[in-house]
Amino acid sequence: MNQNMKRLPYGINDFEAVIEQNQYYVDKTMYLPLLENQPSNIFFIRPRRFGKSIFLSMLHAYYDCSKKEKFQTLFGDLWVGKHPTPLQGKYQILHLDFSYVGGGIEKLEENFNMYLRVKLDGFMRVYQEFYLADFKERFFKSDSGTEKLALLQDETATKNLPLYLIIDEYDNFTNTVLNEQGENVYWAITHADGFYRDVFKKFKGMFERIFITGVSPVTLDDVTSGFNIGWHISTKPEFNQMLGFSMEEVRKMFAYYKEVGGIPAASDIEAMIDEMKPWYDNYCFSEDALHTQSKVFNSDMVI
């Protein structure tokens, strides 16, 4: 077995770690120019364990101005390394994962605000060179996540600093509320003056680009009447294989591990794929792609 064989990144959602630790990465960077040609605020829905988090981590690494100097290290061997886009390394990134927001309904708004505060403080530490000392002092003194968001919005608008918002698991805690607390409680946080709907209103004019993922369109429909500018690409055929693995990507992976001795040299790759297909390969997210593209494998199950 080749000692330099790339390890499979099972359960790892950190793109930088995958690349820097020489783990196997299925290149999805060819979708970046397609995404840039879409409207600037995107919603993308896929089932759980389909590679959403590592895809967002890749977006973060690519567009983050604080990582601009690492472009060749992280992306040099990938498609976009040879075809960089105009927006590479342009943005300050606020990356949120709402699966970290939890607790009982009586604490949900408080926990959400606390999570937002922690993430915004981390944001300011990364990009502090762009902000004056008096603003940073006011920002860090505030103990409210929504107040910090408002302060940041005013300051970045004044300075014309471009921001990119990435949200993973946007519907995580709202789906839990709907399932466990019922429609009335769910309605209270996602409609009218509900805190979750309200924060989406704040996002509306603040970020130059937004990319949001989750597993269900239910919350999307409820909060975006306040947001009112999202572009839903989940069923567009050109993005059908953006997450998960295509048959060709699985074939390429098996060929690599066969070559380096990770699987027996006598392995029949096509037979392996045929055996997997009934279990892991029956996903198609676009009606227009149903007869023109191969079905998509669940990436977590393949790995």
Name each region found by the language model:
Residues 11, 27, 61-125:
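P-loop NTPase motor core
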Residues 99, 168-169, 203-228:
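A short beta-strand-to-loop transition that corresponds to the Sensor-1 phosphate-sensing loop
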Residues 59, 111-113, 179-185, 217, ...:
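Short secondary-structure boundary/capping segments
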Residues 219-226, 233-303:
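Amphipathic alpha-helical segments of the small helical/lid subdomains adjacent to P-loop NTPase cores
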Residues 159-189:
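Conserved P-loop NTPase "ATPase switch" module shared by AAA+ and STAND
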Residues 1-63, 67, 72-81:
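Walker A/P-loop-proximal flanking segment of P-loop NTPase domains
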Residues 133-153:
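Short glycine-rich substrate-engagement loop in P-loop NTPases that contacts/grips substrate
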Residues 151-158, 185-210:
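Substrate-engagement module of ASCE P-loop NTPases
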